[in-house]
């Protein structure tokens, strides 16, 4: 690579949707001939993609901007916190430019102004699947931007706007390019995966030799043609979520749902502006498990929402006992600038919020440990993420990267497993988070690899 190429440092913060934004910016930078460098010292300019969802994320973003300013001095800010430019410029008036999320054009214009490109088409080769910040064997596939819901604790619509779905053929072509580039797991992300296509009136689009609706189920049917793991994230609990469970039971889609329930009190859910039919939610969870016994259900909850009573918190614990969810994340409620929930009466004292959060997580830890223990003796298909000495660290079909558990394959070194390998593992032990086991030697004659159904585009 020519030493004359301008060099850009990049800091990516926030959720997987923001990570996809970062990947798109990085891809465009490389297409235009910029080198991406890993240190502030080596960079001619630094781009910081921020998060601004909760107070801790705002603090982290401001700290990252400050670190880049101190170490480099030439900083371009983008992302969700960029929707509050006055807050950024008050803290760091010397930043070169500020733009909001998915405003790729503004970022590139700011980079051009600070550092004109020197594109060499004979040297600067970028794969057709773009620049990825994830390991090569998995990738996030963003299907839409924004959200039509107005949950009282959330400010995402004010940052990312209303729902804007990508046409289904565009998404499927991107997925095909990713798989052709070596991806073995597609993680479908958006602000509201269940609502995919409603803004486009579920328009039909051609892909390969058939028509697909711009709708969650049709998208999943198309993705199943690629022969890789496909995992659904951020699924809002609409009734039509039931439609994708048969695809999971048939092995066309990973039996995994990331579906945020947020609470179990009808009154609190109403204050949150979330669906409040808790009994129906429990019925649906049980129905999913009956239709697809392998299904893993992950959810997130908010503890200590304004007005939450002792009885309502106890109802939340009872919901955990009844639902028997596999994976759960939770956080204590904290006010978010711009959220309507800030105006609600009867805030829960901070000490009580933390006490409830600890009780909540302890209860779920018992449930998770029991559900993992039940897998001892079973054989789980796993995807290897990391090799540490003689142990291969992998994930089962029930585990999304970074947020769920791991499978520690004790004989990974002996079998010379590699990152990205798919392997069957006999589970021998467990704890409240992870599984432990031994990989079974592959038998190519008995289990031929599934061919990837790829077409050139």
UniProtKB/Swiss-Prot annotation:
Gene Ontology molecular function terms on file: 4 iron, 4 sulfur cluster binding; aspartic acid methylthiotransferase activity; metal ion binding; protein methylthiotransferase activity
Every Radical SAM core domain range: 133-370
Binding, [4Fe-4S] cluster 2: 147, 151, 154
InterPro entries, alphabetized: Elp3/MiaA/NifB-like_rSAM, Methylthiotransferase, Methylthiotransferase_CS, Methylthiotransferase_N, Methylthiotransferase_N_sf, NA-bd_OB-fold, Ribosomal_uS12_MeSTrfase_RimO, rSAM
The protein's required cofactors: [4Fe-4S] cluster
This enzyme's EC code(s): 2.8.4.4
Domain TRAM: 373-441
Reactions listed under catalytic activity: L-aspartate(89)-[ribosomal protein uS12]-hydrogen + (sulfur carrier)-SH + AH2 + 2 S-adenosyl-L-methionine = 3-methylsulfanyl-L-aspartate(89)-[ribosomal protein uS12]-hydrogen + (sulfur carrier)-H + 5'-deoxyadenosine + L-methionine + A + S-adenosyl-L-homocysteine + 2 H(+)
Binding positions ([4Fe-4S] cluster 1): 15, 51, 80
Record's keyword terms, sorted: 4Fe-4S, Cytoplasm, Iron, Iron-sulfur, Metal-binding, S-adenosyl-L-methionine, Transferase
A biological process from GO: tRNA modification
Domain MTTase N-terminal: start-end pairs: 6-116
Main location: cytoplasm
Pfam families: Radical_SAM, TRAM_2, UPF0004
Entry note: cofactor: Binds 2 [4Fe-4S] clusters. One cluster is coordinated with 3 cysteines and an exchangeable S-adenosyl-L-methionine.
General function of this protein: Catalyzes the methylthiolation of an aspartic acid residue of ribosomal protein uS12.
UniProt protein name: Ribosomal protein uS12 methylthiotransferase RimO
Gene symbol of the encoding locus: rimO
